[in-house]
Regions:
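Alpha-helical structural motif
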Residues: 3, 27, 55, 70, ...
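C-terminal structural segments of small proteins and small subunits
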Residues: 63-84
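Mid-chain, well-packed structural core segment of small domains
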Residues: 42-49, 54-67
Length: 102
């Protein structure tokens, strides 16, 4: 399922119109920026299902005007995702360093 369709489903949107489409695009862009900032880097929302689920949830919170509640309600998931993201980035950096020294 396409990410935009998944977000629409998460928000309970079953109709299509230009206003709603534009609103979902703006919310998705905002949520992507927020999560990338929280993770300390760029998340791959196509392959990282943990980050993808957080993105869908954050979009739902923003859509329902409850963005300020997201961090509190998803603190454990955000911490786990950030740790995983940082570990992956560290491993990539270590691998690149190893290749440069060979």
């Amino acid at each position: 399922m396409a990410l935009s369709d998944e977000i629409r489903q998460e928000c309970g949107i079953t109709w299509e119109d230009e206003y709603t489409d534009a609103k979902i695009q703006a919310i998705t862009a905002r949520a992507t920026g927020i999560l990338n900032n929280m993770m300390g880097g760029t998340c791959d929302f196509e392959t990282d299902m943990q980050c993808r689920q957080l993105l869908c949830a954050l979009c739902r919170y923003i859509y329902n005007n409850a963005a300020e509640e997201f961090t509190k309600n998803f603190a454990m998931e955000l911490t786990a995702c950030r740790l995983q993201h940082q570990a992956t980035e560290y491993a990539k950096g270590a691998e690149q360093d190893e290749q440069q020294t060979v």
